[in-house]
Amino acid sequence: MINRIKITIVLLFAVLSASVGKAQEDYRFDIGGGIGMTGYLGDANTANLWSRPGFDAELLFRYLPNPRWGIKTNFYVGSLGGDSAKMTNVFPDGKTFKFSTTFFELGELVEFNFFNYGIGETYRHLKRISPYIAAGLGVTAWSVGGKFGAALNIPLGVGGKYKLSERWNLGFEFLMKKTFSDKLDGAELADPLGIKSSFMKNTDWYSTMSVTISYEFSKRCAACNYKD
């Protein structure tokens, strides 16, 4: 009887050890997608970011060097719009301008997690949830009134991640993106007040606010040295 109890305890310990080991596995990459809302700030909307909200869809691919850092590639397709009739400011001769466009964006972001993000391995103080900050560089393309445009953008923002399970992640992210162009809202609004735009001055902004879900894959080499 005692021997049977010992065998049962040993088997139970082995199963638990295997389960814990599985929960502690690390993965190098993350892939997923999301949907969200967009906003615009420019000549056709100078104050209220979501005066005419649009929508976007997103694909993402993330490299995970360690629990604190992530390097993410994003591809967006979405809509933007603005209407100067809703503004308190007026243009010369009382003109009003309205636009809508579909945009495409490819960007690269560096993310910093405030906590060591992950499941298991208590000695590394992994947290199932973590806020983060992000910054990077991207390129945006659009068409307004049949005229094509493209420009670099600088995305800056914040987000949060939550581990649904060992491999599945739920995320939320808000990014403001400064474009190096004043024609995101159309060539007609490039210089409505006669103030010439430059590479840094009088340029348009837009935002993306997304909910994402992603899946981790490609196990990290167990024999390799891992840097936190």
Report residues per predicted region.
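Residues that define the transmembrane beta-barrel architecture of outer-membrane proteins
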Residues: 27, 51-55, 102-106, 129, ...
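Predominantly the C-terminal beta-signal and adjacent terminal strand-loop region
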Residues: 85, 165-228
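Outer-membrane beta-barrel channels and translocator barrels
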Residues: 26, 64-68, 115-117, 163-165, ...
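Outer-membrane beta-barrel translocator domains and adjoining extracellular loop/strand segments
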Residues: 43-48, 84-90, 121-124, 145-150, ...
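Short glycine/proline- and aromatic-enriched beta-strand/turn motifs that initiate or cap beta-hairpins
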Residues: 22-62, 208-221
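Gram-negative (and chloroplast) outer-membrane scaffold detector with strong preference
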Residues: 67-145, 211
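Residues on the lipid-exposed face of transmembrane beta-strands in outer-membrane beta-barrel proteins
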Residues: 33-37, 57-63, 108-112, 135-139, ...
